[in-house]
């Protein structure tokens, strides 16, 4: 039994190593990752153990295997993008992050998040707000993040316009799963998206509410 637990623990270490490499964009989409042999040497593991981990990643469509150019590659649509694909697909030029961590969660928002996952009580957490601007300096998106203070402190204004997952990867937090609900703001008619993110052990990490400021905007692939 102890031997089985040790194997499972080693598998998790190898799995997380690969996930964090991808999440931090050290291994971006279409990049060839380490070979079975390289991983075997790096982690002092058997070939069968390495293949077991790679099989899990293949089944989750995080990596792919090609025969023409033998090797494992990061999938093109691996799913670590911070932004949802929308009709206008605006590029973020810069972001402004609130310096204060405070209570931002409304009762209505709390109800939406509770419908996504009733086991996470976001009313216990504070929030921080980020404003996003396009290359023409037009303010087009507000995002509120809700989590424990130590998680919120990881967020970096200088990197928010790229991928906030990168900051979590640098801090050893592997984002594995996302649950999402979309709605429309009754007053503005604009798109609102509620997201909850979980690590590779299925533990809640952070939630976000994204308010898009263009009433014509629609999600085409979330």
From Swiss-Prot:
PROSITE patterns xrefs: HTH_GNTR
Keywords (A to Z) from UniProt: DNA-binding, Transcription, Transcription regulation
Molecular function via GO: DNA binding; DNA-binding transcription factor activity
Record flagged with keyword Coiled coil: no
Transmembrane intervals: none
Disulphide-bridged cysteine pairs: none
Tagged with keyword Magnesium: no
Top-level taxon of the source organism: Bacteria
UniProt domain HTH gntR-type: residue ranges: 8-77
Protein name, UniProt field: Uncharacterized HTH-type transcriptional regulator MG101
Biological source species: Mycoplasma genitalium (strain ATCC 33530 / DSM 19775 / NCTC 10195 / G37)
